[in-house]
Amino acid sequence: MIALLILSLTCSVSTYRLQGFTNAGIVAYKNIQDDNIVFSPFGYSFSMFMSLLPASGNTRIELLKTMDLRKRDLGPAFTELISGLAKLKTSKYTYTDLTYQSFVDNTVCIKPLYYQQYHRFGLYRLNFRRDAVNKINSIVERRSGMSNVVDSNMLDNNTLWAIINTIYFKGTWQYPFDITKTRNASFTNKYGTKTVPMMNVVTKLQGNTITIDDEEYDMVRLPYKDANISMYLAIGDNMTHFTDSITAAKLDYWSFQLGNKVYNLKLPKFSIENKRDIKSIAEMMAPSMFNPDNASFKHMTRDPLYIYKMFQNAKIDVDEQGTVAEASTIMVATARSSPEKLEFNTPFVFIIRHDITGFILFMGKVESP
């Protein structure tokens, strides 16, 4: 049997067809148990979706179920996904870049119809036994600006197909934190209390207290300048319960509940980088595509391909000016208002979301900034 490597690299109102796409990434995130987490649900779901297109048999059935799609909805969902990608526009103050590359070994016979339909999305032929790592890194860096996204541990002599998607986001806050007001402050987690650099801003934001099964959480939306992308922050006593409750539909609902308030917001600066093998997570959703005896990608080739590796590398930096995030399966306050104090001095969840499509570009948890 031939093996396939999927590597997802990361550095919304959803249509009903794409809510399953978003939820697949959320479900994957919920299976990560680290303290500090940065993950790209979009990057994960995009890799799974692009694996669905050539899939057949049980592999296609499982991936359709993962995306909560009926067979007849696959074509329209793909059209909506491509349309949604076009809405992730770069502006003067924000930079959003997503690339997709499918590298197929020269020995694999690709069906002409599949090539005709999907080669424009980044289909490359190469010899995986001849300097494939350098060739792939060169192409990915040229298209995305990210360097060294694959190494020799990710590719081997069994690799005949590698799917790589990258997502890079750099955004400037619409209401930046004043760097002169950043002070050391206490942050308390399950390990105790530590001192962290705490940013501070007084401004009008959208926020509210949301209730989930009698548990209350403070949620606030930090918009990025000149873009339809926001970071949503949530804090409460039981953040595990909050995370377990997240779905694409609930994020839509919660975002509509947020109202304008003047906040004195305090948020720690933080930087998180994760490199993880996510094969076991994907295998829970679509096991047959990892099984040499059951995997089927016959819409692309008659060669017996199966997936044997799946990774995601993700990184995020948040400071006074804004956010830099990448993945390699990611108003003025009125003086008459008394600002509502909201300090993120205990573990919290962050979500970077495209508010037009509902795509969750990045999502994570800060346990120890």
From Swiss-Prot:
Gene Ontology MF term list: serine-type endopeptidase inhibitor activity
Locations listed in the record: Virion membrane; Host cell membrane
Cited SMART domains: SERPIN
Signal sequence extent: 1-15
Kinase as UniProt keyword: no
Mode of membrane association: Peripheral membrane protein
Superkingdom of origin organism: Viruses
Keywords: Host cell membrane, Host membrane, Membrane, Protease inhibitor, Serine protease inhibitor, Signal, Virion
InterPro entries xrefs: Serpin_dom, Serpin_fam, Serpin_sf, Serpin_sf_1, Serpin_sf_2
Entry GO CC: extracellular space; host cell plasma membrane; membrane; virion membrane
Family indicated by similarity: Belongs to the serpin family. Orthopoxvirus OPG040 subfamily.
PANTHER family reported in the protein's UniProt record: GH10112P-RELATED, SERINE PROTEASE INHIBITOR, SERPIN
Self-association state and partner proteins as the record states: Interacts with A56 protein.
Protein name, entry field: Superinfection exclusion protein
Organism the protein comes from: Vaccinia virus (strain Copenhagen) (VACV)
This protein's encoding gene: OPG040
